[in-house]
Amino acid sequence: MSAQKLVALLLWPLLVACSDQRAAFEIGSRQHSLTLIRVHTFFWERTASYSLVAARMPECMRRHEMGSGGAESRVEVYAPGNDAWILKQGKRLYVVETRTCEGFARLASEPEGGLGPLRGSFQVRSGALTWIAEPKSENSPPAEAPAAQ
C-alpha cells in the first residue's frame, strides 16, 4: 500500500467526523418555523455549535448564533405569545421572535411573566437531531395562527 493511500485511510475518520444536523418546529405551516442547526465538528468532542433559524416566509428569515453547548443538549421551546419564543438550553435562556425574525437575545434570567407553555424540544435521539412536540393537554392553548398579513 502506498504512503498516500495509507495517509488518506488514516485521515478518513477525521474527514467524515463532522456532523451538521437540522430539525424544524413548524409553528403554523412550513413557512412559519424555528429550525435548530447543530454542528458537531469531531465525534470525540463533547460540545457542538448551535444556531437557530427563525422564519415566517415570505416576510422574513434570519439565522441567529447560539454558541457552543453540550453535544447532546436538549433545547426546549416555550411560547409566551405574540410570535415570541423562549429557548432553554440547560441553564441558558434565549428569546427569539418570528414577526420580523430580527429579535434575538440571551436572557439573564427567566422573564417575570414566566416562560409560557412548553411546545416541545429539540433532542438528539439515536444520533439524530429531532423535534419532539409536547403532548397536547386539555388545558393547552391552541396552536398560534400565522400573523396577519
Name each model-derived stretch.
Residues M1-C18:
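Sec-dependent bacterial lipoprotein signal peptides
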Residues Q4-K5, S19-R22, C60-M66, A84, ...:
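Intrinsically disordered, low-complexity proline-rich regions
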Residues Q4-V7, E45-A48, W85-K88:
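Short, intrinsically disordered, charge-biased short linear motifs at domain edges
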Residues V16-G67:
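N-terminal export/targeting and maturation segments
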Residues D20-F25, S68-Y78, P117-S121:
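Repeated scaffold domains used in trafficking and secretory/extracellular systems
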Residues F43-E45, P58-R62, E72-S73, K91-T100:
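Short, surface-exposed beta-strand/loop "edge" segments at domain boundaries and coil↔beta transitions
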Residues P80-Q149:
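Acidic, small-residue rich beta-repeat scaffolds with periodic aromatic anchors
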